Curated annotation (Swiss-Prot):
Degraded by ASP after secretion and dissociation of the ASP-ORF2 complex. InterPro entries: ASPCH. It comes from the Bacteria. It comes from Aeromonas sobria. Residues 1-22 form the signal peptide. This is ASP external chaperone. Forms a complex with the serine protease ASP in the periplasm. After translocation of the ASP-ORF2 complex from the periplasm to the extracellular space, the complex is dissociated in a pH-dependent manner.
């Protein structure tokens, strides 16, 4: 009788534990970092020391963390630092990319081969814009730059 109850509890709690771990805090070399998801990968971002409480809605979703131009990210202790450039890469032709840029308050930089570069103004939350674009069915990536970054 205990085995089915335990299995049922584990099944019910598994999704919740994943959400609770999604925004965790990590300490390395005496510095505090929090996790952030960018382009489907988890990175570490320096925690500025603020002890903000995370408000959860009734569906238990954690609000998305903001990401701005100049933010520095790391994948781990030994990984190089990556800097958020403020540019979004979107899969769109020239006309569509220009329309997206206008609609979302971005600057159209250039387009080639169906990929356009859209630049955000300083202080813009890139995660919020990327989420909006994805909800519109647009393939989007937030550009990260680093001295040792190489394509996979």
């Amino acid at each position: 009788m205990n085995k089915p109850v335990t299995l049922l509890l584990a099944t019910l709690l598994a999704p919740l534990s994943g959400q609770l771990c999604a925004q965790e805090s990590v300490t390395m070399d005496g510095k505090q970092y929090s996790t952030i998801e960018v382009n489907g990968q988890t990175y570490l971002i320096p925690d500025n020391g603020s002890k903000k409480r995370v408000a959860r809605s009734l569906d238990s979703k954690v609000p998305q963390q903001t990401l701005r131009r100049g933010d520095v990210l790391m994948q781990g202790a030994a990984s190089p630092e990556l800097t958020v450039s403020g540019t979004l890469l979107v899969e769109a032709d020239d006309a569509s990319a220009k329309a997206l840029a206008t609609r979302h308050g971005l600057n159209f930089k250039q387009s080639s081969g169906g990929i356009a570069l859209l630049e955000a103004k300083p202080g813009t939350d890139l995660n919020a814009i990327a989420t909006k674009l994805k909800s519109e069915g647009v393939n989007v990536q937030i550009e990260l730059s680093g001295a040792e970054q190489q394509p996979k």
